[in-house]
Regions:
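Cationic, amphipathic, low-complexity segments that mediate targeting or membrane/lipid association
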Residues: 2-11
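Residue-level detector of alpha-helix boundary/anchor positions
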Residues: 2-3, 18, 99
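Active-site and donor-binding regions of nucleotide-sugar-utilizing enzymes
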Residues: 25-49, 55-145
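Extreme N-terminal starter segment of soluble prokaryotic enzymes
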Residues: 19-23
């Protein structure tokens, strides 16, 4: 965290450009290493930008609860340190919450990938790029469908 406080001005300006909401994904692979780093990252981001909304999606709340006394591993949603903490595995809850308020900025920590429910939300609207071609605008209406 000390290194983050001493970031050059350029990096601090990047923090200012962040949206007001960041969704942080953490798939716990080892017991405490990855969730420990993600916890410190979220804490540092909160300190850098006071009104930042952090939504932390964690695959193993038991591990998180062991390193932080404020986490209840039995709750699939909770508020902690001003963050919204979600259980990665509660598909219905997460899909409902993130459908109402889609993520603006997503951090996939340690290349964890995205949960299936988030993939569905992000890629639910698709269009076929094969149809888009360099055709003059006045001829587009004449293209057969």
């Amino acid at each position: 965290m000390e290194k983050i406080k001493k970031m050059p001005q350029i990096k601090k300006n990047l923090i200012k450009c962040f949206s007001m909401e960041i969704t942080v994904l953490c798939k716990v692979v080892d017991n405490f290493g990855d969730i420990g780093v993600v916890f410190r990252l979220c804490r540092a981001l909160s300190e850098l930008k006071k009104n930042l909304e952090i939504r932390l999606v964690v695959s193993n709340l038991d591990s998180f609860a062991k390193i932080s006394k404020g986490i209840d591993s039995t709750k699939t949603f909770q508020e902690f340190r001003g963050w919204k903490v979600f259980d990665w595995n509660d598909n219905a809850l997460c899909k409902k919450e993130f459908s109402k308020n889609p993520p603006e900025f997503i951090l996939e920590c340690f290349q964890c990938g995205r949960p299936e429910w988030l993939e569905e939300l992000l890629f639910s609207q698709q269009f076929n790029l094969n149809v888009l071609q360099a055709i003059p605008g006045d001829r587009i209406e004449n293209i057969p469908k």
